[in-house]
Curated annotation (Swiss-Prot):
Originating organism: Aquifex aeolicus (strain VF5)
Cited InterPro entries: ATP_synth_csu_bac/chlpt, ATP_synth_F0_csu, ATP_synth_F0_csu_DDCD_BS, ATP_synth_F0_csu_sf, ATPase_proteolipid_c-like_dom, F/V-ATP_Csub_sf
Protein name: ATP synthase subunit c
Recorded family membership: Belongs to the ATPase C chain family.
UniProt site positions, description: Reversibly protonated during proton transport: 83
Keywords assigned by UniProt, alphabetized: ATP synthesis, Cell inner membrane, Cell membrane, CF(0), Hydrogen ion transport, Ion transport, Lipid-binding, Membrane, Transmembrane, Transmembrane helix, Transport
Length: 100
């Protein structure tokens, strides 16, 4: 019960604060929501992708320890590409917050 109350209060309090300022608009609130979703989902996707990449590399090293160096190099290259997804999400969030 307490968790639900906290979730409801967390969702309502920013709207109350924005209404008190007098500048509140639905469009601005949706921009903030979109920016939060952009970075949140991009981070989630990147985290899941990195987890799968590291797991695959560890399984490969466990099967063939001699290929560890090559697999580690390929994993780091793959992690760099996966991390760009999170950076694109951050870029979209900044565009939504400061340009639109």
């Amino acid at each position: 019960m307490m968790k639900r109350l906290m979730a409801i209060l967390t969702a309502i309090m920013p709207a109350i604060a924005m209404a008190a300022e007098g500048e509140a608009s639905v469009a601005k609130g949706l921009l903030y929501l979109g920016a939060g979703l952009a970075i949140g989902l991009a981070g989630l996707g990147a985290g899941v992708g990195m987890g799968h990449a590291v797991r695959g590399t560890q399984e490969g090293v466990a099967r063939n320890p001699n290929a560890g160096g090559r697999l580690q190099t390929l994993m780091f290259i793959g992690l760099a590409f996966i991390e760009t997804i999170a950076l694109y999400g951050l870029l979209i969030a900044f565009i939504l917050l400061f340009v639109v």
